[in-house]
Structure formats: structure tokens, C-alpha cells
Amino acid sequence: MRNKLFDYCCLSFAFGWLLLSSPGAQKELVVNGGFNEVKDGKTVAWNEVKAHYAYRDGVGRSGTRALCFENDDPKFYSFPGQPVDLKAGCCYEYEVWVKTEHLTGDGSGASICIEWVDAKGKWLGGAYAEGVKGTKDWTCVKGVTQEIPAAAAKFRVHPYVRKGMLGKAWFDDVSVREYIPQPMEGLYSTAYRNLAADAEVTFRAAVNLSPAIRAKGVSLRLTYKDASGARRTVAADAERPEWTVSVASLKMGRQNIVAELVAKDGTVEGAADLAFTRVEKLPARASWIDAHGRTILHGQPFFPLGMYWSVVDTNKVDHYAQGPFNCLMPYNAPKSRDLMDYCQAKGLKVIYSVKDIYSGTRWAPRGIKTEADEVRFITDCVAKFKDHPALLAWYLNDEMPLSMLPRLTARRDLMERLDPGHPGWVVLYQYSQIRTYLPTFDVIGTDPYPISAKPALTASVWTRSTQKGTLGCKPLWQVPQAFNWAAYKKTPEEKAKYRAPTEAELRSMCWQCIANGANGLVLYSYFDLFKQPNGERAETRWAECCRVGAEIQAQIPVLLSVEGAGRTLVRAVETAEPVESTAEKPISTRAWVKEGKTYVLVVNGGETAQGVRMSLEDGYSKATNVLASTSGTPILEGPSVLRVNLAPLEPALVCLEPILK
């Protein structure tokens, strides 16, 4: 959250650079990107600039023309732009060269964005690159959009400086081109850290099948060494890029496994590999992820249920420990083992943050000037705390851009070498780019904060997209919104536009995340409750969080059960209300088996009541909702047909008792 550069509307679709060169040069979509063409005294294709911006000769990268910004008014916010022609379903890379001089303020600096609206002019989203501030020579700022949504009708590109920033900036060589990703982005496995001793492992390739690639009649092949050491090759359909093999059939020890995308004529169109290790027995670890995506902490399944913190002190820990939560993620991680000891004594685990230890980034400590400084700091920190029983995981990255992908990947790898006993958790708002971030984390979370600009259903949309992006290879600890955006606004007028989630919204968003695959929740945030914006009472908000958390905490034994693993407990779901978009369907379901009983979680993330009818795998004699409900009891319309009526935003966890045989 803390690295967010814009408000919610701007954040929803902000993405960084994918660091993958497009195959072949694509058509330039910006007209007069260097600002050099002038006609009738006006800069061709660009709108007229307002005060504090100007087009000037001789100040560009090569002594050519450039767009200049000079501002001493913290209230000024305007920027030039031009329309660009983008296509739905495509991604676009965009860039600008910027230079800054004493550019200061809370914003991200001099940057570039693309925004889109629908046919009626309603803002739908955009892509926003991380900017440059301070005093820096010419720097290329760039990013890649998400897939352009079908509803988007008009697009504009803007070189700009964020509101409230003072100083000087220069812009040159604006560019927008269609982004064509590489056919093969990576190869991943369902084994935690690509290490296994038994059972099966599935390998999944991240492929991008453009029409041009499909036209080549491509297929996939996986090459590995079997238990005898012989090389084996297994084929797969390019539309289903996965292979499941017995771990016992793999060569003992470490090997390089390769996936290739091969055209009909034998040409290799793309390839990726991973280092996989078969062992006789899994190593002892304090905290790790099992084959079911569950956290195993000191040998026992664990469902992280916590909140973000700012500073840890014993008084706050005493207060927090009275609630239902079992962990915390403090931005200001404990510097002493005494504080970690105190958390442990109170039954609380700590997700330890090292997310700021990247030189040159906004929140980097003053002493972190080089990557060598980073490694030294991280090494000392890990050595100090890796054996502490309160340590749950390391927090590696809070919304860093994809321009840092090599550094983020190297950080995860470093943490594994220094502490193989704990996973690395990353949280992103770039929820539709999770697949590209896969090498950078062991556990992923995304943080949909929709209230009050967007519906609570956003929690389902983001979690579904996040789960899809992991290729089923990494677990989710999601970050639901418990705070009021007003806590981050400055003026009373700005604060008045926002409110906190209601208890019903918070409850729904948490259960939506779980229903869509989350095996942990860390609410944002505990410390924001005490800012009390718009006259809120902290204890009232805290009580709401506790009630929601307590309801989830009571069901953790069910949520961690794997008795029904591999079974399709819910075969089909029908709703009374038609759903236009699969991505935004209001109903989410997930099921478990615990002590012979089946539990079906069904959540209505929408704003209208829903009747839900589910076809079940087995036959049952009794159905009971174990959560508090205002919509009556669930109904068995037949041994294998369950009907549940749900109020707006309502979850139900239905316990189904099997027919006795």
C-alpha cells in the first residue's frame, strides 16, 4: 500500500515495463513524439499547454525541441496530451525520456501515462509508469498497459508531472507501440521452490499464442531426465501447456527441465527452463507451502489471518492480541528480538518487512545507496531473525514496478539462499500482470481497495485474476480493504468523498477472497483505524474487524482441511440472475471435506440478492449454514442439488451431512 503513487482510480491499472522485447518493430502510434514539428506556431498533434508547461527549442535530448515543466504552485495540475489509436485485447508499450531538476513533492515525479474512456467519456482506466524526481539526467520512463478492455473507445497519452510537485522537468521522445509478448515467458512447477520428494508434480508453461504463432501449428514439448538418467521428451497441446509427472520418475538430485514451443516445421518459437530438484526427503523448514497451497508452520497447517501495521510496540500488541488475528505485517519491522519475543508470547506471528531495501527507490533507508548495500543489510537482517519462532514469512516487495523484475527475482533468490526455512510474500496492485511477476515470490497477494469508488465485488475480480496469473503454482494471501481512503486525503473536501467499508462489505470481501482461492488474509490496516477520518471511532471499526476476523478464525479447521483434495465437490452453479461477464460474476464458491462432512462456501459479492442452485458430486441428507445469515436456511432440492438464497454481499458456509449407507 505505501508505495502507491496515485489514488485508487489511478492505481487500478498501473503497470511497469515487462522487460521483454517485442518481436519485430511495431508501428509508432504517437505523432510528433519529439515535439519538433510546428505548424502555424503550434506543436503538431499536441494540445496547447497551460501555465507551467511550454514547448522550447534547444533543450531536448539532442539539442532539439522538448516539452518543459517549471512549477512553484503546489495546487497546479494540468498536462498536455494527444489521442492515440489502440485496439481492444492488445497491450501497448509506452515511454518518454525525462530530465529533472530539484523536482520535489509526494508524487511519483515526471512520468507518462495512457488513459482510456468509454464511448460516453466515462473514465475506465489507464496505465501509469513510475516517474523520476529529484535532479536526474535524461532517463527513459516506460511501461506496458494491460490488455485494453473491450469497452474502451478513446485513448490519450500524457507526459506529465503529478499534482503538488515543484521544480523543473523536461520531456522528449514520447512513444507508444503495440506490445507483442514473447511466445514463451517461463516454466513453473507446483512444487514449492521446485523441490519434491514424492507424489506428483505439474509443470506449467506461460505461453502467449498470438494469431501468427498459432498459424505455425505449434505444439509443446517438455524435456527432462528420468530416474535412470535417460533424457525424456513429453508432448503437450499448446492450448493446455502443462505436464503432470510422478516425482519418482524423475532423476534424483538437481536437473534443468526445459519446455519448448515448436512449430510444425520443427522451428523452436520459444523456450523456458527451470532447475528442479528431487530429494529423498523434504528438508526441515520452519514455514513453507505444501502441495495444497497451505502454509505449514512448525509442522502444522496455518491460515495467516492478520493486519498491516506501522510501528510495533507492546501496548499495541496487547490490544491487538485480544482480537482474533494470529499474525501482523508491520512496515516498520521489529529491530530487536525482544519485540519479536513479545509477539511470540502473545501468540502472534510476524511477516517481516524488507520491502524497502532497494537502492534508488522512494522508501529505501538512507544508508542503502547500492545493491551491495542491499545485500549487506538483508544478510544481516536474515541472520538476526531467521531462527526466531515468531517469524512467519519475509515481505519482499510492496508494489514495485516490473522495470525492477531482475532485481525482484534476484531478491527472492537471495532470500531463499539466506533463509530456506521461510517463504517470501509479495503484494501487488498489478493484478493482471501476476504471471510476469511469478519468479519474484513464493506467495502472492493483491490488494483490491474498492470502497467507495468501486463495488465490493472487485475483491472477487482481483482474486480470480491473481489466482489465474499464478498458473496454479503459487498460493495467495490476499489483502482486503479495512481502511477508509479518507485517511490518505489532505483536505476536508477530499476526505468527504470517501468512507470506510461497512461491516457487511468487509465481511463479503474477506470471504470473496477465500472463495476464490486465498489461503491467508492480511487486512489493510490496523494503524489506519486510529486515524479516525471523517469522525470515525477507532474502537467501532476495530470491533467490526474483530467480528469479521472471528467468524473466519472459527472456520480455519475447515479452510485448512485437505480431505476432499482433488475432488470436484461442486459440479455446477446456476444463478437466478443472468451474469454477463465471467470475470465479474457475483457468485463465488469453494468446497472442502472435514471429518466426512462437505462444506460449501458460496459468497454473493454483488449488490442484489441472489438465488444460487448447485449440483453436487455426492448425495446428502442435511444442509446447515454455519455462518450467521439473514436469508433463511439452505435447501436440499434433492440429494445432490443444493439451493442457497443470499442477501446482497452475503456469504454462506453450508455444512452437508452425507447420506448414511
Regions found by a protein language model. Name each.
Residues 492-550:
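Aromatic/acidic polysaccharide-binding cleft in carbohydrate-active enzymes
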Residues 358-362, 467-504, 528-531:
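Active-site clefts of carbohydrate-active enzymes
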Residues 267-321:
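N-terminal carbohydrate-binding accessory modules
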Residues 307-342, 346-351, 444:
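Catalytic domains of carbohydrate-active enzymes, especially glycoside hydrolases
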Residues 637-661:
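C-terminal beta-strand-rich structural cap/linker in extracellular carbohydrate-active enzymes
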Residues 377-407, 428-450, 520-522:
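Active-site groove signature of glycoside hydrolases
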Residues 577-620, 649:
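Carbohydrate-binding surface patches
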Residues 24-244:
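Extracellular and organelle-lumenal recognition/adhesion modules and their flexible linkers in secreted
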